[in-house]
Amino acid sequence: RDKIRSKSKQIAGMQLGMALEGRLGIIIDSTARDVEKISSQAANLRSIGYDIHMVFVNTTLEVALERNRSRPRVLPDAVVINSHKQIQKNMGRLQRIFGHRNFLIVDNNKYGEDVNPMVHKKIRGMISRAPTSYQAVRWIHRELEKRKRK
């Protein structure tokens, strides 16, 4: 199992490297518990010209506990409570890292409600904006110049 996991991580790392080299859009899925790691990833992406956004899917502690209990692989309540507290505590810092304009909070407390269409619409709006960073604009210009020469 560890061998498979190690190989999977290696392949994922290579794919990420290629995506970053081509300046493709990427999605990082996280629990938002490790704000230092997220901050580091955000800074690295910004440094190469990425505009970054965060979708923060929020639930109450009660809903988190209830959903945990209905999963096939249940975590102890103490782990869920601790994680939820940490994530809620990190919300303000994450908003500062990503900026108000690029931080979307989704309320995911209602059972049976499909939040995906609403989230998809908001994300499309965020990513359809033209890049604003100097690095991104410069990279796009260089790539367009390369195409003209071919």
Q: Which role fits each region the language model picked out?
A:
Residues 1-46:
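Conserved nucleotide-sensing/catalytic segment adjacent to the nucleotide-binding pocket
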Residues 2, 54, 70:
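Short, flexible active-site loop motifs that bind/organize anionic cofactors or intermediates
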Residues 26, 52, 101-103:
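Hydrophobic anchor at the start of a short beta-strand
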Residues 33, 46-67:
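Conserved phosphate-donor/acceptor-positioning beta-strand/loop module used by diverse small-molecule
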Residues 61-150:
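Conserved GTP-binding G-domain of TRAFAC-class P-loop NTPases and closely related GTPase folds
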Residues 20, 27-28, 54-59, 65, ...:
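Generic hydrophobic secondary-structure signal
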